[in-house]
Amino acid sequence: MPRSNRNDNFIDKSFTVMADLIVKLLPINARSKEAYVYYRDGLSAQNDGDYAEALENYDEALKLEDNPTDRGETLKNMAIIYMSNGEEERAIETYRRALDENSNQPSCLKNMGLIFEKWGRIAEEDGRQDDADRWFDQAAEAWTQAVRLNPGGYLDIENWLKSTGRSNVDVYF
């Protein structure tokens, strides 16, 4: 049974009914509509913490979806799951794929930076300062791009860039 038929929450049910109606009325092909249903069910499963089901739905959506913006959004959600599951290398790879599809996703860059910064802290704690600096530089590169795409949207990151001396962003709000 599709996840959309299992929603117990009134708001979820209402959203699902409205989304189904909109999808039926939109002048898009059946393949794109089916991709959207898989994406929506993946998002619902992800919100419920059922990551395996979410990934299955996202995989199906990717097989059907041709729109790069929608593919990028689907890949971003998959990367978030990998990141939550501790599969950080896979998350980085998937964030990069998402950015290849749609480069205007600052949250992908922000999350990549979080992983790089974490790896830098671990290397620093282990006394591997050269590795730490390399990871911190990669975090700064990803975060600088994120801040440029979303000025003022990541104040904590902007502060980190400034306080570590890694800031080369010329626009702060």
UniProtKB/Swiss-Prot annotation:
Keywords: Membrane, Photosynthesis, Repeat, Thylakoid, TPR repeat
Pfam families linked to this entry: TPR_12 (PF13424)
GO cellular component terms, semicolon-separated: plasma membrane-derived thylakoid membrane
Protein name: Photosystem I assembly protein Ycf3
Topology in the lipid bilayer: Peripheral membrane protein
Entry function: Essential for the assembly of the photosystem I (PSI) complex. May act as a chaperone-like factor to guide the assembly of the PSI subunits.
PANTHER family in the cross-refs: CELLULOSE SYNTHASE OPERON PROTEIN C, TPR REPEAT-CONTAINING PROTEIN MJ0263
Subcellular location: Cellular thylakoid membrane
Predominant place of localization: membrane
TPR repeats: from-to residues: 35-68, 72-105, 120-153
GO biological process annotation, one example: photosynthesis
Family matches, as SMART domains: TPR (SM00028)
Family: Belongs to the Ycf3 family.
Entry-linked InterPro entries: PSI_Ycf3_assembly (IPR022818), TPR-like_helical_dom_sf (IPR011990), TPR_rpt (IPR019734), Ycf3/AcsC/BcsC/TPR_MFPF (IPR051685)
